[in-house]
Amino acid sequence: MALLTRIRGPRDLDRLTPAQLAELAEEIRAFLVEEVSKTGGHLGPNLGVVELTLAMHRVFDSPRDRILFDTGHQSYVHKLLTGRQDFSRLKMKGGLSGYPSRAESEHDVIENSHASTVLGYADGLAKANKIQGHKDRPVVAVIGDGALTGGMAWEALNNIADSQDLPIVIVVNDNERSYSPTIGGLANHLATLRTTQGYERFLSWGKDALQRTPVVGQAMFDTLHGAKKGLKDFIAPQGMFEDLGLKYLGPIDGHDLQALESAFTKARNFGGPVIVHCITEKGRGYHAAENNDEDRFHAVGVIHPDTGLPVKTSGKDWTSVFGEEMVALGRERRDLVAITAAMLHPVGLAPFAKAYPERIFDVGIAEQHAAVCAAGLATNGLHPVVAVYATFLNRAFDQVLMDVALHKLGVTFVLDRAGVTGTDGASHNGMWDMSILQVVPGLRLAAPRDAEQVRLQLREAVEVADAPTVVRYSKGNVGPAVPAVGTVGGMDVLRRPEADSADEAADVLIVSIGAMAPTCLEAAELLAQQGISSTVVDPRWVKPVDAALPGLAAQHRLVVTVEDNGRAGGVGSAIAQALRDADVDVPLRDFGIPQEFLDHASRGEILDEIGLTAPAIAKKIEALVSTRSFARS
């Protein structure tokens, strides 16, 4: 790593020879494999953008020239070149974020890791530069890995194309999974011509001259313009961009430093919005990634660097339980279809796709469309299951509300990675869904506590034909089964009060939501050791509030809700409202995630920090019960 350790900032790259740059690229790849294999992270995308990132930082002057990464998971090389080479605690508490982070460096402009947003940022930044008199400062937006399938990206492109004087360089990182590259001498030649200002001036003059020519001028211009457009669309994929009025350069070999620097220099000097289309290879230089047909090691856990195999085999996770049950349901119900938003493998739908390829729809990074497409499928008598990460459902809220719920359609939304997910940081914690979905009329929301409940509640959800249903579960391994000892209404009783308190009101009713069940049971045991009796129930379906819950609450001195969701507007708030509506005057305390953007750390570390552990919950309950307001009479 002789060269890499000498790089403290982007300008250190200027002194390197072409041979040294090639050597540095290999050092960076070796570093990424060695370090990310120890911590886990987005390995494949970063191996594919080494030369691209080197070229950008040699041509553009960051942070004066803003360099933005859509989604941000391909920013590891950018971090290395901007003074951040300690990857020993990548994505861990106190270590580097797995995404750009403004707290880490002035070179990081944005840190939202939801896809398809970067072009909107670029549009706004460039317009601000113009207003502030900084028109000479280009904004560079790197977008790829399917993010151009998102509608937001095209909304931004439409606006960027309307501002021809904004120096925006849009780098399309095409890793051969979103586009079919067209590479050839003629295409490269035309692309070079189209990004020179002289060519633009010539085109403008020719257009005006032809259109001023009497009788035949306009017809000749239309003919020539049509021929140019037809030839352009035939030989290269720039047509879809140039039809918007955006200039296009490419395709460029994304691993040829000289070609990349030449293209970026032309784009920088053009003075208006330019598309630079770069063909890259995801996982480049690492045999295990290159031979992985599934996703080229898009994201990995801790692996053996030599083989790419996991260091340890994990147990069954929530996602695979869902995937298995979907396959079983598919055998039983021919009307069952599935939708994913570019996350076929991560959300567990790959087995369903293999078994029933005609009943799976991958709509790209387009959660809004996924919801409306599901509405259309349901309208025609099918039952769609839309599987997304919980944090990404935020993007489709209007469609859930107005296109599914308003029409009383039987659509099931399955929310993976619900609650605190940890190492991917603030944008990936699924802590908003149970709050925003509380306001949707008719929607029913399930929070399974274990694998058995995932299977049961998924089956219950797809039986509902006249309203949207939601099933949400956590990330990672699913724990042991948590058996019920009884039922009250539609709720499972997980623990009853001790025998010596059977003839009087128990102290505490603990309402456990989803994966918090083991924590709540442990807290109840700690309370029992202090002489505080408790009942623990799992509502299973947390929206609407079970009709039996107010009556059960009335038999206790204190009600406590514990949820892996933001406290504001969550299940605790809904239960409090239900108690008020039923005139049940029992104090309620809700435990949940504070309404904050939580830094990256492990799930356990975050739960400990915010007080969602059994000892912390028990201690707070003990303090509440010991006050005069809750003392035994």
UniProtKB/Swiss-Prot annotation:
Pathway(s) annotated for this protein in UniProt: Metabolic intermediate biosynthesis; 1-deoxy-D-xylulose 5-phosphate biosynthesis; 1-deoxy-D-xylulose 5-phosphate from D-glyceraldehyde 3-phosphate and pyruvate: step 1/1
Cofactor: Mg(2+); thiamine diphosphate
Catalysed reactions, semicolon-separated: D-glyceraldehyde 3-phosphate + pyruvate + H(+) = 1-deoxy-D-xylulose 5-phosphate + CO2
Function: Catalyzes the acyloin condensation reaction between C atoms 2 and 3 of pyruvate and glyceraldehyde 3-phosphate to yield 1-deoxy-D-xylulose-5-phosphate (DXP).
Source lineage: Bacteria, Bacillati, Actinomycetota, Actinomycetes, Kitasatosporales
Record-linked InterPro entries: Dxylulose-5-P_synthase, THDP-binding, Transketo_C/PFOR_II, Transketolase-like_Pyr-bd, Transketolase_BS, Transketolase_C, Transketolase_CS
Residues reported to bind thiamine diphosphate: H73, S113, H114, A115, G146, A147, N175, Y286, E367
Organism: Kitasatospora griseola (Streptomyces griseolosporeus)
NCBIfam families according to UniProt: dxs (TIGR00204), PRK05444.2-2 (NF003933)
Gene3D superfamilies documented for this protein: 3.40.50.920, 3.40.50.970
Highest taxon of the lineage: Bacteria
Entry's cofactor comment: Binds 1 Mg(2+) ion per subunit.
Binding site for Mg(2+): D145, N175
Protein name (database record): 1-deoxy-D-xylulose-5-phosphate synthase 2
HAMAP family to which the protein is assigned, alphabetical: DXP_synth
Record note on quaternary structure: Homodimer.
Keyword vocabulary terms for this entry: Isoprene biosynthesis, Magnesium, Metal-binding, Thiamine biosynthesis, Thiamine pyrophosphate, Transferase
Pfam families per UniProt: DXP_synthase_N, Transket_pyr, Transketolase_C
EC class name: transferase
PROSITE patterns: TRANSKETOLASE_1 (PS00801), TRANSKETOLASE_2 (PS00802)
Protein family per UniProt: Belongs to the transketolase family. DXPS subfamily.
